[in-house]
């Protein structure tokens, strides 16, 4: 079978080595005679796996003991509600840095629980879009927390500067950013991430939260979204998505074998640089994002002649380059280059783009 490269924004590719290991262990995990999908989440074997997964994640991100790691459900959208219910702490407002679709979605959900402020940071210089630097963010001193999204998958925008605001709780939606590069976890109080981009299959959500902000949830908070309840029950207040947890653990081990986040960050830059170079050196393709804020995870580009979009997608799919259609909000194309996307996949895409430009340009 020809190699298929999945450029979807999520669910995304999972490393081939991880899939092969999961396939090998599917019917008989740890010589138990059962699949991990079939055993109790309270069994000794599963708990050991869960502890290993957390340890590997802590090693990768250098998470100190002052943080809890929670494996939850509900995706990032679940956290859009959980965050205000857990962190407002009787205050009436929070600051939401608005850089695109997902940060705005979090803001809109927060309006159900408080009076949040949307701080719009996008600006256009000529034809290129960029983002205001953090020192120009108009932060409200009375806000309960600051929420931002370092990578907007739909818009192809990234904030690489890490937040430093004194006496403020910093919350980050890292769904498409986590494990793609090294970060200083101590600059944050809570980061959360849906798994289906850089971690594993859809169904599990990871929360990394500073211990001293757990325990201030409002009375209206459902137990399933209460960080203290989840923490006290070791992420097993209800039956967790066991297979997604297991696969995430395999991905963490795979990342460590690749050399950790420094090596992954270097490879991710190489992949995105290759694709952006192709776009920038062409009059056939265009990217409208300032180079300082271009996403390494989600490369958004347009054909100068949009009438060729359908043909581009159809011919790309025939060569094994799948799910390149851009989101309906922005149109065009989007190539998601998450950790599991090999360099060879990007090279194949660039080669196809050159062929397509030569034929139709």
Curated annotation (Swiss-Prot):
What protein name applies here?
A: Phosphoserine aminotransferase
Q: What does this protein do?
A: Catalyzes the reversible conversion of 3-phosphohydroxypyruvate to phosphoserine and of 3-hydroxy-2-oxo-4-phosphonooxybutanoate to phosphohydroxythreonine.
Sorted keywords for this record are:
Amino-acid biosynthesis, Aminotransferase, Cytoplasm, Pyridoxal phosphate, Pyridoxine biosynthesis, Serine biosynthesis, Transferase
Q: What residues bind L-glutamate, as annotated?
A: 42
What NCBIfam families would the database entry show? PRK05355.1, serC_1
Gene Ontology CC: cytoplasm
Protein family membership? Belongs to the class-V pyridoxal-phosphate-dependent aminotransferase family. SerC subfamily.
- Answer whether the UniProt record assigns the keyword Amino-acid biosynthesis to this protein: yes
How is the cofactor bound, in the record's words? Binds 1 pyridoxal phosphate per subunit.
One GO MF term, please? O-phospho-L-serine:2-oxoglutarate aminotransferase activity
User: Where would you find this protein in the cell?
Assistant: Cytoplasm
**What do we know about how this protein assembles, alone or with others?**
Homodimer.
Kindly tell me the pathway this chain contributes to. Answer: Amino-acid biosynthesis; L-serine biosynthesis; L-serine from 3-phospho-D-glycerate: step 2/3; Cofactor biosynthesis; pyridoxine 5'-phosphate biosynthesis; pyridoxine 5'-phosphate from D-erythrose 4-phosphate: step 3/5
Q: What is its EC number?
A: 2.6.1.52
């Amino acid at each position: 079978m020809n190699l298929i490269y999945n450029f979807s924004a999520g669910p995304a590719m999972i490393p081939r080595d991880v899939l092969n290991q999961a396939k090998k262990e599917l019917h008989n995990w740890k010589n138990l005679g059962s699949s991990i999908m079939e055993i109790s989440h309270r069994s000794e074997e599963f708990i050991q796996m869960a502890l290993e997964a957390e340890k590997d994640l802590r090693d990768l991100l250098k998470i100190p003991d002052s943080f809890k790691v929670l494996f939850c459900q509900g995706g990032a959208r679940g956290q859009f509600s959980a965050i205000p219910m857990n962190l407002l702490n009787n205050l009436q407002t929070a600051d939401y840095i608005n850089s695109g679709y997902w940060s705005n979605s979090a803001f809109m959900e927060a309006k159900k629980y408080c009076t949040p402020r949307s701080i719009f940071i996008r600006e256009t210089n000529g034809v290129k879009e960029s983002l205001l630097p953090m020192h120009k963010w108009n932060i409200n001193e009375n806000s309960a927390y600051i929420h931002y999204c370092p990578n907007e998958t739909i818009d192809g925008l990234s904030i690489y500067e890490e937040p430093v605001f004194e006496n403020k709780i910093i919350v980050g939606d890292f769904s498409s950013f986590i494990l793609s590069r090294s970060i200083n976890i101590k600059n944050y109080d809570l980061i959360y991430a849906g798994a289906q981009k850089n971690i594993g299959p859809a169904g599990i959500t990871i929360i990394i939260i500073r211990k001293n902000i757990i325990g201030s949830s409002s009375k209206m908070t459902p137990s399933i979204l209460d960080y203290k309840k989840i923490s006290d029950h070791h992420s097993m207040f209800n039956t967790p998505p066991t297979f997604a947890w297991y696969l995430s653990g395999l991905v963490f081990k795979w990342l460590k074998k690749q050399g950790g986040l420094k090596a992954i960050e270097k490879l991710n830059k190489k992949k995105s640089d290759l694709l952006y170079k192709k776009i920038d050196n062409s009059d056939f393709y265009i990217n409208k994002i300032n180079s300082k804020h271009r996403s390494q995870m989600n490369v958004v580009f347009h054909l100068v002649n949009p009438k060729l979009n359908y043909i581009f997608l159809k011919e790309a799919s025939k060569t094994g380059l799948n799910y390149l259609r851009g989101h309906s909000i922005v149109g065009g194309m989007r190539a998601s280059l998450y950790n599991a996307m090999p360099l060879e996949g990007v090279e194949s895409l660039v080669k196809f783009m050159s062929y397509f430009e030569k034929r139709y340009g």
